[in-house]
Amino acid sequence: MKTLLDVYSDYGSIISFSSEAGNMLAKNVISQVPLIWKTNVSTSHNIVGSLAFIDDSTYVCPVDSFYIQVEYAPIGTLFTLEIYSDLLDPPSYSYSVTTTAETEVLTLMADYQTIGYFWKLVITPPSSSYVKIGRVMVGQAWQPNIGPSGDVTVSKNPFIKSER
């Protein structure tokens, strides 16, 4: 069974679900992803999220893909996906891809067996510019007979307005 969490990158962000399982309604995102990241040379920007089932936060599911729709990023912008069991520990999995065009769709694939409570998307432009992300989608997979079958939520660390 697979759930695709669709995180729209604007100030009215919601998460919508596309899954083999029914009755999964859209949930409001706690902290919206800023539409544009203003950058300095070699400045990295992080989007950090947690993976948990609403009705049982102790059940951990594997992340198998991130789909990122890049509206604009300088050629050579590095996107890195990191999966964590604990944000204080080194990532249990890391995968990077570099943009080859200013507008493109990126798919960051994780090992299907990678288990984590947290994910981090690190965006590193090659020069002083900005990055505009149109959509971020998170692919999760889990065994249908293990763990709960309820809603899935993603919570993100809050952004301070001055940092946007």
Describe the predicted segments one by one.
Residues 75-87:
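Short, surface-exposed beta-strand/strand-loop-strand elements in extracellular ectodomains
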Residues 72, 88-90, 94-96:
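Flexible, glycine/threonine- and acidic-rich loop/arm segments that mediate assembly and lattice contacts
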Residues 50-62, 93-135:
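Beta-sandwich interaction modules
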Residues 61-73:
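A short beta-strand element within beta-rich, extracytoplasmic domains
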Residues 63, 125-162:
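Exposed low-complexity, polar/acidic, P/S/T/G-rich flexible segments that act as propeptides
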Residues 1-56, 147-163:
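Disordered, acidic Ser/Thr/Pro-rich linker "stalks" and the adjacent N-terminal cap
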Residues 70-78, 127:
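Extended, low-complexity, turn-rich repeat/linker tracts enriched in Gly/Pro/Ser/Thr and Asp/Glu
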Residues 67-69, 82, 122-124:
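Residue-level recognition of well-ordered beta-strand positions that form the cores
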